[in-house]
Amino acid sequence: MKLSALLALSASTAVLAAPAVHHSDNHHHNDKRAVVTVTQYVNADGTVVIPAANTATSAAADGKVESVAAATTTLSSTAAAATTSAAASSSSSSSSSSSSVGSGDFEDGTISCSDFPSGQGAVSLDWLGLGGWASIMDMNGNTATSCQDGYYCSYACSPGYAKTQWPSEQPSDGRSVGGLYCKNGKLYRSNTDTNSLCVEGQGSAQAVNKVSGSIAICGTDYPGSENMVVPTVVGAGSSQPINVIKEDSYYQWQGKKTSAQYYVNNAGVSVEDGCIWGTEGSGVGNWAPVVLGAGYTDGITYLSIIPNPNNKEAPNFNIKIVATDGSTVNGACSYENGVYSGSGSDGCTVSVTSGSANFVFY
Protein backbone atom coordinates (compact mmCIF):
# COMPACT_ATOMS: atom_id res chain seq x y z
CA MET A 1 0.00 0.00 0.00
CA LYS A 2 1.30 3.46 -0.92
CA LEU A 3 2.43 5.67 1.92
CA SER A 4 0.17 8.44 0.66
CA ALA A 5 -2.77 6.22 1.52
CA LEU A 6 -1.69 5.64 5.11
CA LEU A 7 -4.20 6.56 7.72
CA ALA A 8 -3.14 8.64 10.68
CA LEU A 9 -5.09 7.07 13.49
CA SER A 10 -5.40 9.37 16.46
CA ALA A 11 -6.41 7.35 19.49
CA SER A 12 -7.24 10.44 21.50
CA THR A 13 -7.99 8.86 24.84
CA ALA A 14 -7.98 10.90 28.02
CA VAL A 15 -5.77 9.54 30.73
CA LEU A 16 -6.97 12.58 32.62
CA ALA A 17 -8.18 11.50 36.00
CA ALA A 18 -10.54 13.46 38.11
CA PRO A 19 -8.79 15.49 40.81
CA ALA A 20 -7.73 13.33 43.71
CA VAL A 21 -10.23 13.08 46.53
CA HIS A 22 -8.51 13.97 49.79
CA HIS A 23 -8.81 11.60 52.72
CA SER A 24 -10.12 13.38 55.79
CA ASP A 25 -6.89 12.80 57.73
CA ASN A 26 -4.38 12.91 54.89
CA HIS A 27 -3.00 15.23 52.26
CA HIS A 28 -1.25 15.14 48.91
CA HIS A 29 0.34 17.91 46.90
CA ASN A 30 -0.97 16.87 43.49
CA ASP A 31 -4.53 17.13 42.24
CA LYS A 32 -3.57 17.10 38.57
CA ARG A 33 -2.99 14.30 36.13
CA ALA A 34 -1.59 14.02 32.61
CA VAL A 35 -3.70 13.59 29.50
CA VAL A 36 -2.12 11.30 26.94
CA THR A 37 -3.06 11.42 23.26
CA VAL A 38 -1.58 8.58 21.26
CA THR A 39 -1.01 9.14 17.53
CA GLN A 40 -0.05 6.13 15.45
CA TYR A 41 0.32 5.52 11.71
CA VAL A 42 -1.49 2.44 10.46
CA ASN A 43 -2.13 0.80 7.10
CA ALA A 44 -5.46 -0.46 5.82
CA ASP A 45 -5.03 -3.67 7.80
CA GLY A 46 -4.62 -1.75 11.03
CA THR A 47 -0.92 -2.56 11.33
CA VAL A 48 1.15 0.15 12.99
CA VAL A 49 3.80 1.40 10.58
CA ILE A 50 6.13 4.35 10.18
CA PRO A 51 6.38 6.26 6.89
CA ALA A 52 9.43 5.46 4.77
CA ALA A 53 12.40 7.59 5.64
CA ASN A 54 16.02 7.61 4.74
CA THR A 55 17.80 5.32 7.15
CA ALA A 56 21.05 6.50 8.63
CA THR A 57 23.40 4.10 10.34
CA SER A 58 25.79 5.78 12.72
CA ALA A 59 29.46 5.09 12.20
CA ALA A 60 30.30 6.64 15.54
CA ALA A 61 28.60 7.45 18.82
CA ASP A 62 28.17 11.09 17.79
CA GLY A 63 27.22 10.37 14.17
CA LYS A 64 24.35 12.39 12.75
CA VAL A 65 21.05 10.93 11.68
CA GLU A 66 19.94 12.40 8.38
CA SER A 67 16.24 11.74 7.87
CA VAL A 68 13.18 13.48 9.20
CA ALA A 69 11.26 11.67 11.93
CA ALA A 70 8.34 9.60 10.79
CA ALA A 71 6.09 10.96 13.48
CA THR A 72 6.27 13.91 15.80
CA THR A 73 5.31 14.21 19.40
CA THR A 74 3.58 17.28 20.74
CA LEU A 75 2.62 18.40 24.18
CA SER A 76 -0.23 20.86 24.63
CA SER A 77 -1.66 22.23 27.84
CA THR A 78 -5.02 22.12 29.54
CA ALA A 79 -5.99 23.86 32.74
CA ALA A 80 -5.37 20.71 34.70
CA ALA A 81 -2.48 19.05 32.93
CA ALA A 82 -0.29 18.57 29.87
CA THR A 83 -1.28 16.59 26.78
CA THR A 84 1.20 14.32 25.08
CA SER A 85 0.81 13.32 21.42
CA ALA A 86 3.36 10.66 20.59
CA ALA A 87 4.22 8.00 18.09
CA ALA A 88 5.04 5.76 21.00
CA SER A 89 2.36 4.77 23.52
CA SER A 90 2.05 2.60 26.80
CA SER A 91 1.82 -1.02 28.21
CA SER A 92 0.29 -4.05 30.24
CA SER A 93 1.47 -6.77 32.64
CA SER A 94 5.20 -7.21 33.05
CA SER A 95 7.29 -9.96 31.51
CA SER A 96 8.49 -12.54 34.00
CA SER A 97 11.54 -13.24 31.84
CA SER A 98 12.88 -9.68 32.10
CA SER A 99 15.69 -8.97 34.50
CA SER A 100 15.09 -7.04 37.70
CA VAL A 101 16.95 -4.99 40.26
CA GLY A 102 16.91 -5.99 43.90
CA SER A 103 17.99 -8.69 46.28
CA GLY A 104 15.62 -11.58 45.63
CA ASP A 105 11.89 -11.87 45.16
CA PHE A 106 9.33 -9.86 47.07
CA GLU A 107 7.43 -11.90 49.66
CA ASP A 108 3.86 -10.88 50.39
CA GLY A 109 2.91 -10.08 53.96
CA THR A 110 6.46 -9.95 55.35
CA ILE A 111 7.17 -6.20 55.28
CA SER A 112 5.21 -3.70 57.34
CA CYS A 113 3.45 -0.91 55.48
CA SER A 114 5.42 1.53 57.63
CA ASP A 115 8.69 0.18 56.17
CA PHE A 116 9.84 1.09 52.67
CA PRO A 117 11.05 -2.03 50.76
CA SER A 118 14.35 -0.54 49.58
CA GLY A 119 16.11 -3.91 49.72
CA GLN A 120 13.79 -5.20 47.00
CA GLY A 121 14.97 -2.84 44.26
CA ALA A 122 12.67 0.08 44.99
CA VAL A 123 14.29 3.52 45.37
CA SER A 124 13.25 5.68 48.32
CA LEU A 125 12.19 9.25 47.46
CA ASP A 126 12.86 10.83 50.83
CA TRP A 127 12.36 14.45 49.71
CA LEU A 128 8.65 13.91 49.02
CA GLY A 129 7.72 13.39 52.66
CA LEU A 130 5.81 10.18 51.94
CA GLY A 131 8.05 7.71 53.72
CA GLY A 132 10.01 7.00 50.55
CA TRP A 133 6.95 6.30 48.38
CA ALA A 134 6.26 8.07 45.08
CA SER A 135 2.56 8.33 45.91
CA ILE A 136 -0.03 6.75 48.18
CA MET A 137 -3.55 6.41 46.80
CA ASP A 138 -6.62 4.24 47.14
CA MET A 139 -8.96 3.07 44.40
CA ASN A 140 -11.31 6.01 45.03
CA GLY A 141 -8.63 8.65 44.50
CA ASN A 142 -8.03 9.39 48.18
CA THR A 143 -4.40 10.18 48.94
CA ALA A 144 -2.32 9.86 52.10
CA THR A 145 1.09 10.78 53.45
CA SER A 146 1.81 7.34 54.91
CA CYS A 147 1.30 3.85 53.52
CA GLN A 148 -1.77 2.43 55.26
CA ASP A 149 -4.47 -0.21 54.92
CA GLY A 150 -6.52 -0.01 51.74
CA TYR A 151 -3.98 2.11 49.87
CA TYR A 152 -1.66 1.41 46.96
CA CYS A 153 1.84 2.59 47.77
CA SER A 154 3.68 3.45 44.57
CA TYR A 155 7.46 3.45 44.31
CA ALA A 156 10.36 4.38 42.03
CA CYS A 157 12.96 2.04 40.53
CA SER A 158 16.57 2.60 39.50
CA PRO A 159 17.30 4.34 36.16
CA GLY A 160 16.49 2.03 33.26
CA TYR A 161 13.92 0.08 35.29
CA ALA A 162 10.17 0.37 35.87
CA LYS A 163 7.89 -0.79 38.65
CA THR A 164 5.95 -4.00 38.11
CA GLN A 165 3.12 -3.50 40.57
CA TRP A 166 -0.39 -2.30 39.75
CA PRO A 167 -3.82 -3.92 40.13
CA SER A 168 -5.39 -5.37 36.99
CA GLU A 169 -8.67 -3.74 37.99
CA GLN A 170 -8.27 0.01 37.57
CA PRO A 171 -10.63 2.90 38.42
CA SER A 172 -13.47 3.25 35.92
CA ASP A 173 -13.09 7.04 35.67
CA GLY A 174 -9.75 6.83 33.84
CA ARG A 175 -7.41 7.36 36.77
CA SER A 176 -4.52 4.96 37.16
CA VAL A 177 -3.42 3.26 40.38
CA GLY A 178 -0.15 1.47 41.01
CA GLY A 179 2.14 0.16 43.72
CA LEU A 180 2.16 -2.38 46.51
CA TYR A 181 -1.10 -2.89 48.39
CA CYS A 182 -1.25 -2.36 52.14
CA LYS A 183 -3.49 -4.87 53.96
CA ASN A 184 -3.60 -5.57 57.69
CA GLY A 185 -0.45 -3.53 58.15
CA LYS A 186 1.61 -5.55 55.64
CA LEU A 187 2.64 -5.01 52.01
CA TYR A 188 1.33 -7.26 49.25
CA ARG A 189 1.89 -7.41 45.52
CA SER A 190 -0.94 -5.95 43.48
CA ASN A 191 0.37 -7.80 40.40
CA THR A 192 1.04 -11.41 41.37
CA ASP A 193 2.27 -12.30 37.87
CA THR A 194 5.77 -11.22 38.91
CA ASN A 195 7.78 -11.63 42.10
CA SER A 196 10.14 -8.70 41.53
CA LEU A 197 9.31 -5.06 42.15
CA CYS A 198 11.26 -3.63 39.20
CA VAL A 199 11.68 -4.73 35.60
CA GLU A 200 14.34 -3.62 33.13
CA GLY A 201 13.27 -1.60 30.11
CA GLN A 202 14.37 -2.25 26.55
CA GLY A 203 17.83 -0.79 27.20
CA SER A 204 17.86 1.11 23.91
CA ALA A 205 18.47 4.66 25.18
CA GLN A 206 20.79 6.56 27.49
CA ALA A 207 21.08 10.15 28.67
CA VAL A 208 24.56 11.58 28.07
CA ASN A 209 25.47 14.80 29.86
CA LYS A 210 28.14 16.95 28.20
CA VAL A 211 27.39 20.15 30.12
CA SER A 212 29.06 21.33 33.32
CA GLY A 213 26.15 20.81 35.70
CA SER A 214 24.13 17.82 36.87
CA ILE A 215 20.76 17.27 35.18
CA ALA A 216 17.72 15.89 37.04
CA ILE A 217 15.45 13.95 34.69
CA CYS A 218 12.12 13.16 36.33
CA GLY A 219 9.90 10.33 35.14
CA THR A 220 6.20 10.24 35.89
CA ASP A 221 4.82 7.95 38.59
CA TYR A 222 2.69 5.82 36.29
CA PRO A 223 0.47 3.99 36.79
CA GLY A 224 -0.19 6.10 39.85
CA SER A 225 -0.25 9.79 40.67
CA GLU A 226 1.48 10.75 37.40
CA ASN A 227 3.64 13.18 39.36
CA MET A 228 7.08 13.65 37.84
CA VAL A 229 9.04 12.33 40.81
CA VAL A 230 10.95 9.25 39.57
CA PRO A 231 14.59 10.40 39.33
CA THR A 232 17.36 9.82 36.84
CA VAL A 233 20.23 12.12 37.78
CA VAL A 234 22.96 12.51 35.16
CA GLY A 235 26.12 14.07 36.51
CA ALA A 236 28.35 16.30 34.43
CA GLY A 237 30.36 14.22 31.99
CA SER A 238 28.45 11.02 32.77
CA SER A 239 25.56 8.96 31.43
CA GLN A 240 22.57 7.06 32.78
CA PRO A 241 20.15 4.58 31.20
CA ILE A 242 16.73 5.84 30.21
CA ASN A 243 13.87 3.46 30.91
CA VAL A 244 12.43 2.60 27.50
CA ILE A 245 9.13 0.96 28.34
CA LYS A 246 8.43 -2.38 26.66
CA GLU A 247 4.96 -1.31 25.65
CA ASP A 248 3.76 -4.68 24.39
CA SER A 249 4.13 -6.29 27.82
CA TYR A 250 3.71 -3.39 30.26
CA TYR A 251 0.80 -1.50 31.80
CA GLN A 252 -2.06 -0.67 29.44
CA TRP A 253 -4.52 2.14 30.00
CA GLN A 254 -7.97 0.97 28.93
CA GLY A 255 -6.38 -1.46 26.48
CA LYS A 256 -3.95 1.07 25.03
CA LYS A 257 -0.17 0.90 25.31
CA THR A 258 1.70 3.51 27.30
CA SER A 259 5.25 4.88 27.09
CA ALA A 260 7.59 6.60 29.54
CA GLN A 261 7.54 10.37 29.95
CA TYR A 262 10.32 12.44 31.52
CA TYR A 263 10.46 16.08 32.61
CA VAL A 264 13.96 17.51 32.24
CA ASN A 265 15.05 20.31 34.56
CA ASN A 266 17.70 22.91 33.83
CA ALA A 267 21.26 21.83 34.55
CA GLY A 268 22.15 22.61 38.15
CA VAL A 269 18.67 21.95 39.59
CA SER A 270 18.89 19.29 42.31
CA VAL A 271 16.75 16.18 42.29
CA GLU A 272 15.07 17.35 45.50
CA ASP A 273 14.10 20.66 43.88
CA GLY A 274 13.37 19.29 40.41
CA CYS A 275 11.62 15.93 40.78
CA ILE A 276 8.46 17.32 42.36
CA TRP A 277 5.10 18.71 41.33
CA GLY A 278 6.21 22.29 40.73
CA THR A 279 4.40 25.57 41.12
CA GLU A 280 3.52 27.96 38.33
CA GLY A 281 6.57 29.76 37.00
CA SER A 282 8.99 27.69 39.08
CA GLY A 283 10.67 26.13 36.04
CA VAL A 284 10.92 22.75 37.79
CA GLY A 285 8.93 19.51 37.83
CA ASN A 286 5.86 19.88 35.61
CA TRP A 287 7.18 23.37 34.80
CA ALA A 288 10.53 22.03 33.57
CA PRO A 289 11.56 23.38 30.15
CA VAL A 290 11.45 20.16 28.14
CA VAL A 291 9.90 16.67 28.12
CA LEU A 292 11.28 13.40 26.74
CA GLY A 293 9.33 10.35 25.60
CA ALA A 294 10.57 6.76 25.29
CA GLY A 295 8.86 3.52 24.32
CA TYR A 296 9.49 0.22 22.52
CA THR A 297 6.83 -1.61 20.53
CA ASP A 298 6.77 -4.06 17.63
CA GLY A 299 10.56 -4.17 17.50
CA ILE A 300 11.06 -0.40 17.26
CA THR A 301 12.18 2.11 19.89
CA TYR A 302 10.56 5.56 19.68
CA LEU A 303 12.38 8.48 21.30
CA SER A 304 10.97 12.00 21.45
CA ILE A 305 11.86 15.52 22.52
CA ILE A 306 8.64 17.32 23.41
CA PRO A 307 7.85 20.96 24.24
CA ASN A 308 6.28 21.64 27.63
CA PRO A 309 3.35 24.07 27.23
CA ASN A 310 3.80 25.16 30.83
CA ASN A 311 7.25 26.54 30.07
CA LYS A 312 8.15 28.11 26.73
CA GLU A 313 11.67 29.01 27.85
CA ALA A 314 14.53 26.97 26.38
CA PRO A 315 16.64 24.97 28.86
CA ASN A 316 20.19 26.06 29.68
CA PHE A 317 21.53 23.34 27.37
CA ASN A 318 20.80 21.85 23.94
CA ILE A 319 19.51 18.31 23.31
CA LYS A 320 19.86 15.94 20.38
CA ILE A 321 19.09 12.28 19.81
CA VAL A 322 22.16 10.53 18.41
CA ALA A 323 22.53 6.95 17.19
CA THR A 324 25.14 4.88 18.99
CA ASP A 325 27.92 3.19 17.06
CA GLY A 326 26.49 0.70 14.56
CA SER A 327 22.85 1.48 15.36
CA THR A 328 20.13 2.33 12.84
CA VAL A 329 17.86 5.31 13.44
CA ASN A 330 15.13 6.84 11.26
CA GLY A 331 14.72 10.57 11.70
CA ALA A 332 16.55 13.53 13.16
CA CYS A 333 15.56 15.18 16.41
CA SER A 334 17.17 18.03 18.33
CA TYR A 335 16.30 21.07 20.43
CA GLU A 336 19.02 23.64 19.89
CA ASN A 337 18.98 27.28 20.96
CA GLY A 338 15.25 27.04 21.62
CA VAL A 339 14.41 25.59 18.18
CA TYR A 340 13.23 22.05 17.43
CA SER A 341 14.42 20.26 14.32
CA GLY A 342 11.87 19.27 11.73
CA SER A 343 8.50 21.01 11.81
CA GLY A 344 9.48 23.60 14.38
CA SER A 345 7.55 23.99 17.62
CA ASP A 346 5.85 20.60 17.87
CA GLY A 347 8.86 18.59 19.00
CA CYS A 348 10.24 15.60 17.16
CA THR A 349 10.52 11.81 17.26
CA VAL A 350 12.97 9.26 15.91
CA SER A 351 12.59 5.51 15.52
CA VAL A 352 15.45 3.21 16.45
CA THR A 353 15.12 0.08 14.32
CA SER A 354 18.31 -1.58 15.57
CA GLY A 355 20.74 -0.87 18.37
CA SER A 356 20.25 2.17 20.58
CA ALA A 357 20.45 5.96 20.72
CA ASN A 358 21.45 8.64 23.21
CA PHE A 359 19.72 11.76 24.43
CA VAL A 360 22.78 14.02 24.38
CA PHE A 361 22.74 17.19 26.50
CA TYR A 362 25.35 19.68 25.33
UniProtKB/Swiss-Prot annotation:
Annotated GO MF terms: hydrolase activity, acting on glycosyl bonds
One example of a Gene Ontology biological process annotation: autophagy
EC number, UniProt record: 3.2.1.-
Signal in keyword set: yes
Leading EC class: hydrolase
Membrane-related topology note: Peripheral membrane protein
InterPro entries: Beta-Glucosidase_SUN, SUN
Major localization listed first in the record, in broad terms: mitochondrion
Keyword tags: Autophagy, Carbohydrate metabolism, Cell cycle, Cell division, Cell wall, Cell wall biogenesis/degradation, Glycosidase, Hydrolase, Membrane, Mitochondrion, Mitochondrion outer membrane, Polysaccharide degradation, Secreted, Septation, Signal, Stress response
Residue pairs linked by disulfide bridges in the UniProt entry: none
Compartment annotation: Mitochondrion outer membrane; Secreted, Cell wall
Region forming the signal peptide: 1-17
One cellular component (GO) term of this entry: fungal-type cell wall
PANTHER family in UniProt: BETA-GLUCOSIDASE-LIKE PROTEIN NCA3, MITOCHONDRIAL-RELATED
Stated family: Belongs to the SUN family.
Known function: Involved in aging, oxidative stress response, and in the regulation of mitochondrial biogenesis. Inactivation of UTH1 increases life span, leads to higher resistance to heat stress and to hydrogen peroxide, and increases sensitivity to the superoxide radical-generating drug paraquat and to copper. Also required for the selective autophagic degradation of mitochondria (mitophagy) in response to nitrogen starvation. Involved in the remodeling of the cell wall during the various phases of yeast culture development and under various environmental conditions and plays a role in septation.
UniProt-recorded name of the protein: Probable secreted beta-glucosidase UTH1
